[in-house]
Amino acid sequence: FEEQIMMEADRLRNPSYYPEGSDYLAEYIRNHKLAEYLELIKESKKICTIPVIASINCYTDAEWVDFAKQIEEAGADALEINILALQSDIQYKYGSFEQRHIDILSHIKKTIRIPVIMKLGSNFTNPVALIDQLYANGAAAVVLFNRFYQPDIDVEKMEHTSGDVFSNASDLSTTLRWIGISSSLVSKIDYAASGGIHKPDGI
């Protein structure tokens, strides 16, 4: 997760340090976390007989294009891009979040040759139009849908707490509905369902 890596690096920044030292520490944390993930891919390839699909959760296209290349070199058979971000800016420009998906995909496709899969959220006004544009820009497949972290409040302690971590079976109907709609209109791209699959019947 891009935000987790960046948050940990920022957390270790100390204003009392020299700026160069603080930047070095942040860069070390980032590189260490990414190296751990690349090693996981390499080890998985040694023991798995099925394709290994790597996944990165990001919301910018700055450094993740380079990381995608490293993932390919580590042996991943495909790469899933999960662009998960809560849009709450009052100055938000309509359509800019959809365009960010297309821009990140386009940049990554120029760097790697393995298939790129885009995982989408369920809060788009018109997922079909976005899927069509993703296919036009080289996406091999889409996954519907990703899921926001669900915060909650403990009313007894009046503290923030985590909400339900897992999906529930009722989530599947929305996913299947949109896969049905989208696949009938944009049929040349592959689809995968995510969330709400709790028993064999869902598969």
Placement of each model-derived feature along the sequence:
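Alpha/beta enzyme core
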Residues: 4-16, 32-42, 46-53, 57-194, ...
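Short glycine/proline- and acidic residue-enriched helix-loop micro-motifs
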Residues: 19-28
